[in-house]
Amino acid sequence: MMSRLHSAARWLQGVSNRRRAIVLLLFIGWAAVHATDGRAQRPTFREEWAAGVTGGINYSTVFFAPKVHQSPMQGFNGGVALRWITERNLGLQLEAGFRQLGWRERFDEQPQYRYIRRMNYVELPFLTHIYFGSDRVRFFFNLGPQIGFLTGESTDENLNGATPNKTNDQHTMAIERRFAWGLCGGPGVELRTSVGYFQLEGRYYYSLGDFYSTRHGDAFSKASPQVFTMRLAYFMPFTLRH
């Protein structure tokens, strides 16, 4: 067993950050599912449907190559969700929402400058919902692919044509690829009451696409965002009539 773990560690050191993120998310999901295999049998399972609303804040940066010095940019998110618990400890969750992400540049040597790019996306995550716990409190992990479409962008800056960073092409470049796709996942806790289910969830999104053209000869060879989200959600269960 230890030799397998050492081999896996050596393999992870040799892969790219993007592949490492994918492998990590898939491993966490696999471990969460198998962690429930040994639990004692409970009363007969019944499928569960719930619909909810979500909202919170997110902090985003962008992986640029060449590198752009940044600080996390704060944005907000909100949306709706539909959840279907298909079997014990496992379900599906479909979401539709709005999220604001982008980047805030750092000018350490010339702090009088400011540059913030905000990008607004409509997003559709398709998630596997893994949970365990009691009838009162559940811990869960959501994991799956996500697609999005850019609906608008805005800039807050005072550069006035100055080029204070080593990389400055992005200051005058509009977003070139409006479609986005990637992987997202994260843990959360759910309090189940007679008036509905209340959630607190953290989530990480890693874009597998670039919003600028990254062909040979372009200004950037990489331009993909990553987003950390903290959000609250309220779900109301309902029953489907057959």
Residues covered by each model-derived region:
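Extracellular loop and loop/strand-boundary signature of outer-membrane beta-barrel proteins
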Residues: 63-68, 110-115, 169-175, 215-220
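Gram-negative (and chloroplast) outer-membrane scaffold detector with strong preference
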Residues: 41, 45, 49, 83-159, ...
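Flexible, solvent-exposed coil segments and beta strand-coil junctions
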Residues: 56-62, 102-110, 160-170, 209-214
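Predominantly the C-terminal beta-signal and adjacent terminal strand-loop region
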Residues: 95, 180, 185, 192-242
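Residues that define the transmembrane beta-barrel architecture of outer-membrane proteins
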Residues: 47-49, 72-76, 118-124, 137, ...
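Cleavable N-terminal export/targeting peptides
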Residues: 1-46, 238-242
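Outer-membrane beta-barrel pore domains and translocons
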Residues: 56-60, 97-99, 144-148, 203-207, ...
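Short glycine/proline- and aromatic-enriched beta-strand/turn motifs that initiate or cap beta-hairpins
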Residues: 36-81, 237, 242
